[in-house]
Amino acid sequence: GSPNAVGVMQFMAEAGTPMLAPVGTTAVVLPMDEKRRWVFKTTQNDALISDALIAHMVKHGVRTVGFIGFNDPYGENWYTVFSAQAQKAGIRIVASERFLRSDGSVAGQVAKLMAAKPDAVLVAAAGGPTVLPHTTLVDTGYKGRIYQTHGAAAPDFLRLGGAKVEGTVLAASLMLVLPEVAD
């Protein structure tokens, strides 16, 4: 993910070896410099996905959002991008929480989110760990809409989350459903 790609950029540049980075953060390609010229990002920028999520929020009357994301560059970049775009759209972030990829519980963070009574919650995580805050919100009775980043667009999210993640809103690449797209 993002932390790994950022961590090896210097080594790839020194070796003159191109690196394919399946990450959302633009930090691996911007600002362009000698080490970033070796990185080729394969997924959409977080800003593009954030814009789509915010458009959906606006369309559905969301005025307040709780944010919970990884306590690493992925989560921090998402908070930076999303908070700026949300503010422009008139959406207020009423709670902001972080968690580690290895956490076994986010009960404390979810309690703080619930106390803020947001219209919706955005989970900024990737892979299997996207399920933990989502299912914890559901288990504690949260009734608002739950949004996920394109980091949740993976089979593990559905497999691990099961029925508790039904109704999730996320934006992702057509590559995920390419066989279903008409020619």
Positions of PLM-derived features:
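Rossmann-fold dehydrogenase core element
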Residues: 38-41, 163-175
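Venus flytrap/periplasmic-binding-protein-like
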Residues: 20, 26-27, 101, 143-165
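Short beta->alpha connector loops
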Residues: 1-3, 46-47, 127-128, 152-153
